[in-house]
Amino acid sequence: WEQYYRRRNHLARNHAPLEAKRFAGMAGEMAAVLWCGLVLLLGFGIPSAWLLWAAWRYVGDTDWAAFAHMGFYTLRLALTVAAIGTALAFVLQAWQRATARGKGLIRLAGLGYGVSGTVLAIGVLMITTAFDHKINAISKALGFGMVGLIWSGTIAALVYAFLCRFAAVSLWAVESGFAHIPPSLDQSAFLLGCSEKQTAWRLWLPLLRNSLVTAALLLFLESMKELSAAMLLRPFNVQTLSTYIYEYISAERFEMAALPALLMVVLGLPLVALLLKTMED
């Protein structure tokens, strides 16, 4: 039966090749513009207009001190994850390039992208909590007393979870950049007396500039909008943009979520434009 249906539904045998439909004349061009504009209007224009209206109407009810702290915390978290994740991706891919080893380790590091944020956050919470308990037990045994939650109660747990969650994004971006560097350049550098570290610093790093920028931008965007891991691992009395929006949406106070949603859009759109420009280059 499988072979029968496969033969029956084979596109190459039963259907003509797909051809792009071309619009002729001014009417066709206007139809294409209107159709694309309608998609943009429904998907971005109308929602953005409503967010602007709601943010303007309820701007007087905003706690600006808490809002600024939340925005700064989200920005610091995303920048930290982007910097550390991009650096680790470059180090791992450079090590794999120089030694032809570690391919399995890189694939293992990228498995977190296929795990949901909630499941990953629970695993990270178990690890960080056990680490904190062990540190407190050792400190108490040495007579220094309890040191508190130095791992699970800080931004470090979020950074760790986000790096595990989005490592694949940066690894793939850097790996794609390395694929465009011919091995003959590496051999030339080695013949000229450059060590592996010098080759990585003086050859690979400049050539991978666009790939590293792409990896950093992707990590920043993913970290800024991640919700489930942030809900479980954020320190007490600390909000990110995504958790702040979620709490107001859950309470059906949609207007109060408009301003942080706009801030997320304002932060994300220029980065997306820069990302597209970098990928084109």
Question: Which residues are covered by each model-predicted region?
Answer:
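Transmembrane alpha-helix signature in integral membrane proteins
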Residues: 1, 5, 65-96, 104, ...
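C-terminal transmembrane helix and the adjacent membrane-cytosol boundary/short C-terminal tail
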Residues: 1-23, 92-101, 175-186, 190, ...
